[in-house]
Amino acid sequence: MLIDMVRVRRGATAAEAMVDRRTGRTWTVDVRTFDIATTVVTLGQWNALRGTETDPSQAAFPKVDVSWRQAVAFCNEMSLRDRLEPAYTITTIDAPTRSHATWTPHDEPAPYEWGVTWDREANGYRLPTAAEWQVACRAGSTGPRYGDLDEIAWYADNSLGFMHPVAEKTPNAWGLFDTLGGVWEWCWDQYDAEVYGSYRIIRGGGWSDPHWGCRVGVRRKTNPEAAFDDLGFRLTRTITE
């Protein structure tokens, strides 16, 4: 199973400007060199790692209905397969018996039940940071999109109400497909730990979203245990130069 990736070099663009439209806060991020997959993980790639056969007609569709935690675990499994150093250390303990006193929103596991730490020097597969994702999506462009939306993305106005295989639309200038539209993509970052706890950032918009949801700067959040039919993920690797 080949993961086609492109290299984004540090300094390829100016420090990326990030915006939190909820609070109005702005900041810049200096992004190190990294590799990022040209497509989101497909159902065929997901099943191949697990030794499961895939209907050829379904193999090129994005792998969806996958939680952030499942995506992190997949990254580590891929790293071990390719003899790379896993980027994540995952810790789990048995969950305590729940009561009204220990209930959390959406029955979300408490932080001490499932934890992930990221070794930022490891060369294994991982999820992109929100800043890395944004740099890769822009591919040196400016403005809310890197091209005409109908040409580059599957979204509400052209998807006919269902998901499509990857890489059918025009890629961006760096050869990445479907960074807008298609499926939302998990990022590493927490959205706002003080307000939303462990909720993670998702980017890019999906096949059922209106045009305003498919813009480079759009940041949304969801529970790391959540899994939806328009949410997938894209592999990234740290590169030391």
Where are these regions (language model features)?
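Residues within well-ordered beta-strands of beta-sheet-rich folds
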Residues: D35-A37, C187, R234-T236
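Functional-site microenvironments in short loops/helix caps that host divalent-cation chemistry
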Residues: S57, W68, V72-R220, A227-D229
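Short loop segments at secondary-structure junctions
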Residues: G11, Q190, G205-W207, T238-E241
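Charged DNA-binding/catalytic regions of mobile-element recombinases
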Residues: N223-P224, E241
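A generic structural signal for ordered secondary structure
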Residues: M5, G204, L235-R237
